[in-house]
Structure formats: structure tokens, C-alpha cells
């Protein structure tokens, strides 16, 4: 197996995988940002309206949020989305929230490596 196949085999609990295999892999880390986050929040809201309240995450220490696409906010919707992300991180105990203008700012796709939140072999 090549390195990608080994990583996916580990994450899916299989001894091996091959091209064209369909696997369900457990992720090591989850990243949200100010573009993807609002869509995630809509799913949580939809579930709540269906009577399925999600009161906790699988592991808040494996989730991190970055504000880097629509900051500083140029319109009301972008600003509201940042507030919603902040509320989400507070409500679900996510400590790794890289807020624009708080000395924690960075590009989400490089923060993962610069802050050692994702390590070689991780699926995220």
C-alpha cells in the first residue's frame, strides 16, 4: 500500500485498502472557517427543528475554527456569521478559535500546520 492507502486503512479500521475501495474513515481533526461554518450551523439548526438536538460534539478538542475569508467583515451578513461562529465555539466548548484581530489571525489552511494541530498521517 502507498502512504495514502495506509492512512485511510488506519482511519477506517481496515488492514488494507486499495484503489476504488469505498471507506468510512474516522477523522482526526475538523476545521471550520467563516465560509464553511455557516453551512454547518444550518445543519445543526435543521436537526434541532426536527427534534434532534445536538448538545455536544464528538470531541471539541479535535475541532478548530478560523476567521480568515470575510474579515474584516464588509457587510452585515459576514459580521453576523462571525458572531454565530463565536457563539458556536462557546456553546460547544471549542477552545481553538482563531479570531481576526485578536492576535490569533492566520490563514486556515496554514494554521493547521503552523500550530501543529494536524500531524503527518492525520485525516482532516
What residue spans do the PLM features occupy?
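Fe-S-dependent hydro-lyases/dehydratases of central metabolism
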Residues: 1-124
Amino acid at each position: 500500500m502507498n502512504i495514502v492507502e495506509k492512512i485511510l486503512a488506519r482511519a477506517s479500521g481496515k488492514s488494507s485498502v486499495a484503489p476504488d475501495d469505498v471507506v468510512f474513515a474516522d477523522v482526526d481533526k475538523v476545521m471550520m472557517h467563516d465560509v464553511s461554518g455557516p453551512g454547518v450551523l444550518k445543519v445543526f439548526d435543521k436537526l434541532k427543528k426536527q427534534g434532534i438536538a445536538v448538545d455536544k460534539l464528538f470531541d471539541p478538542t479535535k475541532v478548530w475554527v478560523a476567521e480568515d475569508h470575510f474579515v474584516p467583515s464588509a457587510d452585515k451578513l459576514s459580521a453576523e456569521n462571525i458572531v454565530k461562529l463565536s457563539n458556536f465555539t462557546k456553546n460547544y466548548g471549542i477552545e481553538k478559535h482563531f479570531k481576526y484581530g485578536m492576535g490569533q489571525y492566520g490563514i486556515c489552511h496554514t494554521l493547521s500546520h503552523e500550530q501543529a494541530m494536524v500531524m503527518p498521517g492525520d485525516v482532516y
